[in-house]
Regions:
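Cytosolic regulatory regions built on CNB/CRP/Popeye-like sensor folds
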Residues: 1-139
Length: 139
């Protein structure tokens, strides 16, 4: 199952560019999470320590009462929680039964301590995202 999960993780921008070996290593740390329709997966304002990639089903992303996005298979959320464990910026609810790969921050951090190449790759991805976010501000 780790090989298929590694393929799912390869589609996540935070992990783009990682070797297959590193993707398999991260995949080995994931667990399957199951949420019935209507269940809260993440709650805005609460601390987050888990990253999810949806493998089956659909979910809704809300800020307050307003729906800001809809998620389906291969969509992901909570990646910033892997880095800082800060509060969730939105709520995510299962619109139908959802299955997802989940990766907990503590497991991810332990792996990073043993795999410095992964740290460098992720820092590069985050730096690129920061530059892209700052571009409109500089104009």
């Amino acid at each position: 199952m780790a090989r298929k999960d590694a393929e799912v993780l390869a589609g996540v921008p935070l992990f783009s560019g990682l070797s297959k070996r590193h993707l398999r290593r991260i995949a080995s740390l994931t667990e399957e999470a199951v949420f019935p329709a209507g269940a809260a997966i993440a709650t805005e304002g609460e601390s987050g320590d888990t990253f999810y990639v949806i493998t089956e089903g659909r979910a809704r992303v809300r800020r307050g009462a307003r729906t800001v996005a809809r998620l389906g298979v291969d969509d992901f959320f909570g990646e910033v929680s892997l880095i800082d464990g800060g509060p969730r910026t939105a709520s995510v609810d299962a619109q139908e039964d959802v299955r997802a790969l989940s990766l907990h921050r503590a497991e991810f951090r332990r792996m990073l301590e043993r795999e410095p190449a992964v740290v460098v790759r992720i820092l590069s991805e985050l730096a690129m995202r920061l530059r892209q976010a700052e571009r409109p501000l500089a104009g």
